[in-house]
Amino acid sequence: MLFARLAGAMNHLFFLLTLAAYLGSFAGYVGYLVAGREWSGRLGSLLLALGLAAHYFALLERARGLHTVPYHDLAGSMSLFGWLLALTYLSLELFHRQRSVGAFVLPFVLAFFLFAQLSPPDRLAAPPAAGVTFAFHVTLSILAYAAFGLSCVLSLIYLGEQRLLHQHRVGDVVWRLPSLDLLDRMSQSSVLVGLISIAIGTVLGFVWVDRLTGNVWRYDPKYVITLLVLVAYVFYLRLARNPGWRGARASQLCVFNFAIVIFSFTVVNLFFSRSHRYF
């Protein structure tokens, strides 16, 4: 009883710390984008890093409380997605030295985190899955979804900024956004992370299935949609480097590709796949 109360208190503490850090980070990024305060942007990045740390421990406490992986249900999967989305964005921010899009990314991170925390627990039994191989398979798969989601956000920013520039509606906020070329490169970087993650994650998934059933070719509709996602994003990277497709067309294709990812993560997982309900 005492342990259960302590675990509940820790979960509540990490929830509050994560929420406060993410909200503060969002405010910092907005201050940087709207007012151009450099210290505000740095504070946003710092609070995002602190939020990632608190969110990680929240996932860890959730796993301990459930005595299983933290993503065996929809809430856990969404929470992990939000954490990996924030992690991917912060990595991209540091790599490209550009933090002005943080104000657009943090609302999605907050939405996934809050959805996971406020949704009712899933009463479905956890799948008979365990082991390091399975854990890496799921984590890398959700990392790929998060990276593809980030590329979609960046592509939407690209399309919005391009439209404002063409309409000559240029204000201080637009000037603080990354250049169109940098947004394009950031989107491609995010897609590359997603492709590497989903490729390795898929291979690990086949290895795990072979160990579990002895039949690596056991059919699952998820295999087909995953192959389609891989082909779609490889096609995007190819066209994004073509002068005739670079820019707006490539960004539109990136948004369309993420619609396939959403279809895979929702419709295919929930209604067609036997072993990929939440990842």
Regions found by a protein language model. Name each.
Residues 1-8:
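N-terminal amphipathic/basic-hydrophobic helices that include classical n-h-c signal peptides
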Residues 11-123, 139-164, 180-212, 218-279:
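Hydrophobic cores of alpha-helical transmembrane segments in multi-pass integral membrane proteins
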Residues 127-142:
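Active-site glycine-rich loop that binds ribose-phosphate moieties when present
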Residues 129-130, 173, 213-215:
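Glycine-rich, flexible loop/turn motifs
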Residues 166-181:
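Juxtamembrane inter-helical linkers in multi-pass membrane proteins
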